[in-house]
Structure formats: C-alpha cells, structure tokens
Amino acid sequence: MFYCACWGSALLERLFPGLMRRFNFQIGLAILAVVLVCLVFPCRAVGQDAEPADSSTPLVAATAHDTDTSAQQTSADTPPAAAPAGTEPESSDVLTLFPHSETSRYWISGQANIVLQWHGRFPAAYSGTNSFKPAPENTTSKVYTLYLGYELTHTTEVYLDVESAGGHGLSNALGLAGFTNLDVVRNPTLGDVPYLARLMVRQIVPLSKERVTVERGPLALATSLPARRLEFRLGKFTIPDFFDANTYGTDSHLQFLNWTVDNDGAYDYAANTRGYTDGAILEYDDHWFSARFGVMLMPKVANGIFLDADIARARGENLELDATGNWLLHRSGTVRLLSYVNIADMGNYQEANQNFLNGQGAIPNIISTRRQGRHKYGFELNFEQELPAHLGFFGRVGWSDGRNESFAYTEVDRTVQAGVFTKGDKWRRKNDRAGGVFVANEIVAAHEQYLGYGGLGFLLGDGALTPGPEKIFEGFYTAHLWRGFFASCDFQHINNPGYNKARGPVFVPGLRFHVEF
C-alpha cells in the first residue's frame, strides 16, 4: 500500500502540478491506494467459491419503485437478504457496516458520502459572474444521512430522515448545466447544520391476494407486497425517490456523480435548493406495469430554499408510466415515460431579452419579468436494458419547452444520455461496479440569447456566449472494500462548459468514499 500511495502521489503531482502543496490530499491518497490494492490483488472471503460467477446470472431483478435514489441501492446495487438465523454471511456478501433485520418493524441506518474533486487550469476567452472558474480548484463535499422507519401495520409505514450536507462544489456549483457532483447544495450559505430531509407516510392498499417479493430498504420496510396494489405517499421527500429512477444511473453514492447523469437534466422537478419538497404521490402497481402521479410544492423563487405553500397557485404535477419485460435477448428491461408541468412565479426569457433591447438595464434581468401562474412543461423517455456478461445499457432523452426560466433543478432544456454499467463478477469482485456515460445538454434559442446578452441564471452567466451544446463524458469505478465501505475513482470531461464554445474543455477527476451503516 505504501508503494501504491507513493505512486499515486507522484502521478497526481505530475498531472496536476502544485496540487499536493495546495490541498490536504492524504485522505484522497489513502482512498486511491486502497482502490489500487483491491484492483491489483482481488481478494475473497475465506471459503468463498473461487469460480467466477456464471455470466448467465441476471444482473437486475425487476422491482417496483420501492427505493430511494439518494440512499437507495436499486436492484443492481441492493444488498442481499439477511442470512438465516445461525448462519454467518460471508464478508464479501455483507454490504452494510452493521446487519439489518429483514423482519423488524423498525428501520435504523445511515450513510456517509465524501467526494473530493479538482481541476487544473483550462482555456477560457472570458469569464463572468456565474462562470466555472478557469484557475485550478479543489473542493470536498460531505453528506451524512440518518434513516429511520417504522411499520405501523402491514400496510402503513412512516419514515423520518435527518441529513447534513457540508463542503462546497467547484466554483460554488456555478458555470455548468451538468454539474460534476450531485451531492453539492447550490446555496453555499446554508452551511452543514442538520435538517429534516424526509418525513413521510406510506399507505399500501392491496388489490390482489398474490404477493411479490421486494427489497427492504430505507424507504421500503415490507419484504413482500400485493402484486396488484395502490400506494399513497404523503409528506416531505425528494421527487427522484420515486420518479425518473434508473437501475444503472441514479445513485451518486455508488454510481455516477454528474447531476445530468443521475437525473434527466431537462426534468425541472419541484424542489428547494436542497432538493426536497412537500407533496403527495399516488401509485398503481400491477406485475410488469406501474403508474404514478404526484403533486408537489414549488419554491417561492428560482433555486429558493423556501416552498410556496399555496398549492392552488404554485405546484409541480408529475406523471410517470413504466413497463418491465424481457425486451431484448430474453433479458429484463424497463421503459419509463414521464411528463411534468410546473406552475410558479416564473420569468420569461424572450420578455427579458426584449426589455433589454428596449433599453431597460445594462443586461437582461429575468427576475423583473416574473409573473405568478406561468407554466413550464416537459417530457422524458428513460430506459434500461440488461445485457449478457453482467452488462447493462441505459439512457434518457429529456425535453422541456424552455420558454420560462429554469426554476428548480438546472439550466437544461434538451438532453440525451447513453451509458453502460457493469459489475465485477468477471474479475471475481462481484460487489465492485463500473460505468461510462455520454451526455449532451442544450438550451432553447431565447435562453441562449439571454446568456449571450450577459443575463444571469441561477447557475449560468459568463457575461457573453458563443453557443454550443454542453457535452460530458463520465466514467467511474467503485471498489467494495469491506462490509459497508466503498471507494471510487471518477473522471469527467466537459466540452463547452455552460454551453460556451469560448471556454474549456475541462477535465474533472474525483475520489469518493462511501459508508453504508
């Protein structure tokens, strides 16, 4: 490990001169060293079968939306069920630091996710107030979550989660539509004081006697559910807990980090700046088909921390349909169709541009054009497909009308992504995972003109714009170290950051350390 650490230190110093002097990188080097050791010397628990896993073993088990995207392990990443009483599970099969009961009415767990990212100097013809900084930077983000749940009856569950999000993003999370770290809170003044993330009731209404087995987790206590059922959720949560899920690209703790990979960038879902909202969701599940509709509160202002409690005048309406079947090569796949409508106190890009051209202000100001009751709507196709050899293929295509301002998630009006995901069975590290994905983001012409005239969004604003699509490639490798400990290497390459051909490209490597308690 000493040699790995020295090698890693020398490599980073050569790639990023002066970085080691400016940044306390001991933690990062330790993570890198452990990952390298795990890759070079694959290890197995005593007694583990030395034969590689059968490549015909399915990678994904079809499950309902009974998981959480920020705490979840979706099917491909879900810890296996607890071993029978009196049986000691092999250490390679235990993916949490402490065991969790499969039968208790209580749920208590936690997680810690620490992300280190940096970039070197990159070319930029000019920079503005909201630009991604061309000078070298390094940052660390930290998210800690406590998950609590209780099963009141066989059909009623309650959840309470407390979270702390600290640290900062590169350039204070400005200058990129597809920002490099989903864990970053976009308002650095909020600090890391713990806050209530979720407070929610889940009610299950059986519609059939047949039952199906599902994974138990932080937002799903039952291990079996009626095959046909209604589910009603009410309270505080984040919309990606239940909408826009994807087995291969939705989890910033063990998978990708970019926030236009883990979610549809054009899905401007209702949320405050921390990503949470209050609302209600009604879901229907029937074997291979699911449908869900939700109504949630919108923030009072774009990227605001406070929600507008008047749901009659401001709200987000979301509808998603999904179907699971053996679509290709007799292997499981899922297709999801999503639509949304937001109603809020929004500004209009075309109106802001026209006011500027009429001499109102030195730059266009979208805030001055805000009017209550404006709409923004969009659609998405989301798919995942299991392939042979422990591979998975996934992608999203997102579209929003883009006339009114980006309000809650990020400044994207069109997005396309495609990626691959695999687990480490082939190299005898079945709990490791790796993936690569390409994303292209765009905005509508009026939005481009607004930024070109010097206007500021809540994320973007270079003072001028040479327009072009923002193109991102991200790759990662996550190594399972022991029980609930994971370490990851991540790299992202971004062309035309903030839709600006006059800036970039920029290369953003990163390290991630994750613990599941």
Language-model region placement:
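Outer membrane beta-barrel transmembrane domains
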Residues: 322, 338, 342-373, 394, ...
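Residue-level signature of outer-membrane beta-barrel architecture
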Residues: 114, 150-152, 162, 203-205, ...
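Transmembrane beta-barrel strands of outer-membrane/channel proteins
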Residues: 112-118, 160-164, 232-236, 293-297, ...
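N-terminal periplasmic/intermembrane-space "pro-region" immediately following the signal or transit peptide
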Residues: 43-137, 147, 151-153, 157, ...
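Short loop/turn motifs that connect adjacent beta-strands in outer-membrane beta-barrel proteins
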Residues: 96-108, 120-121, 150, 154-158, ...
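Surface-exposed coil loops of outer-membrane beta-barrel proteins
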Residues: 174-198, 208-320, 364-365, 455-465
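Outer-membrane beta-barrel "beta-signal"
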Residues: 197-210, 505-517
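Residues that define the transmembrane beta-barrel architecture of outer-membrane proteins
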Residues: 104, 138-144, 192-197, 274-278, ...
